[in-house]
From Swiss-Prot:
Family: Belongs to the MinE family.
Biological process terms in GO annotation: cell division; regulation of division septum assembly
Listed InterPro entries: MinE, MinE_sf
Free-text function comment from the UniProt entry: Prevents the cell division inhibition by proteins MinC and MinD at internal division sites while permitting inhibition at polar sites. This ensures cell division at the proper site by restricting the formation of a division septum at the midpoint of the long axis of the cell.
Gene that encodes the chain: minE
Gene3D superfamilies: Cell division topological specificity factor MinE
Pfam families, alphabetized: MinE (PF03776)
Protein name: Cell division topological specificity factor
Entry keywords, A to Z: Cell cycle, Cell division
Length: 94
């Protein structure tokens, strides 16, 4: 999410159709370049949410994990709004 997207969201502005189309095309290209199946990407999202939720209280409804491409580089981007930190220590793994 760019700064402009954040400002537009805060002000309640709707994105222009050209901007929306460009964002969708970038998403399709990112998915294509990553060679990840939709099922694998969904599994990754669930697991990322589970791991982060061990340390902080996150808003799962507002959270998002996506692939973004910029300058021919594809990145996995997690946008997970925190509600509050979890004060107890995370469970130890075996």
């Amino acid at each position: 999410m760019t700064l402009r997207d954040l400002v537009d969201k805060l002000l309640g502005r709707q994105p222009a159709s050209a901007s929306t189309a460009r964002d969708r095309l970038q998403l399709v290209l990112a998915h294509d370049r990553s060679d990840l199946s939709p099922e694998l990407l969904d599994q990754m999202r669930r697991e990322i949410f589970e791991v982060v939720a061990k340390y902080v209280d996150i808003d799962l409804e507002e959270g998002d994990v996506s692939l973004e491409t910029e300058d021919r580089v594809t990145a996995l981007v997690a946008n997970l709004p925190f509600r509050r930190p979890i004060t107890s220590a995370p469970p130890k793994s075996d």
